[in-house]
Design a protein with these regions (language model features):
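Select subsegments of transmembrane alpha-helices in polytopic membrane proteins
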Residues: 13-18, 108-123
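Membrane-embedded alpha-helical transmembrane segments of multi-pass integral membrane proteins
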Residues: 21-24, 121-128
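Membrane interfacial helix-start motif at the N-side
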Residues: 49-57, 101-111
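Juxtamembrane inter-helical linkers in multi-pass membrane proteins
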Residues: 85-105
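Short, basic/aromatic recognition patches
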Residues: 9-37
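Short, Lys/Arg-rich, polar N-terminal cytosolic tail immediately upstream
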Residues: 1-8
Length: 128
């Protein structure tokens, strides 16, 4: 019982951290918005030369949209394992891990991994 509570509280804490990362990303975008040039390079060729540009509002909306999408994606993928048919879940030995006696623990572990990846991805997007 204690292990179950620990896993639940761990995933709840990570969910809160992921949402805090999203709020930080929104604040990050809002903070740097006034400092952006009117035309922002958004695409680069193989030599690193810019070949695509957007207005600073388009760029900011793109950043906010992609960061929000990443957050929603990683929040939703973990619990989705619970309701998907076993044939749609790509895990090694999925019949073993998604057997009724192990499915709840597997879902918690997958959710944990998705939350960690979501946090890491949002932090990466803020850094670039």
């Amino acid at each position: 019982m204690l292990a179950r509570q620990t896993a639940l509280s761990r995933n709840l804490i990570l969910t809160i951290v992921l949402l805090l990362c999203l709020l930080t990303a929104i604040g990050h975008t809002a903070y740097f918005y006034p400092h952006l040039p009117a035309r922002v390079a958004t695409h680069f060729d193989g030599q690193g030369e810019p070949n695509g540009f957007s207005s600073k509002i388009e760029y900011s909306l793109l950043m906010l949209g992609s960061q929000s999408a990443v957050c929603l994606l990683f929040l939703g993928l973990g619990p989705l394992v619970k309701v998907l048919p076993v044939s749609l879940v790509n895990l090694p030995n999925r019949e073993y891990w998604l057997a009724p006696e192990r499915k709840a623990e597997t879902v918690k572990r997958v959710n944990f991994g998705m939350l960690i990846m979501g946090i890491s991805t949002l932090l990466f997007l803020m850094a670039i």
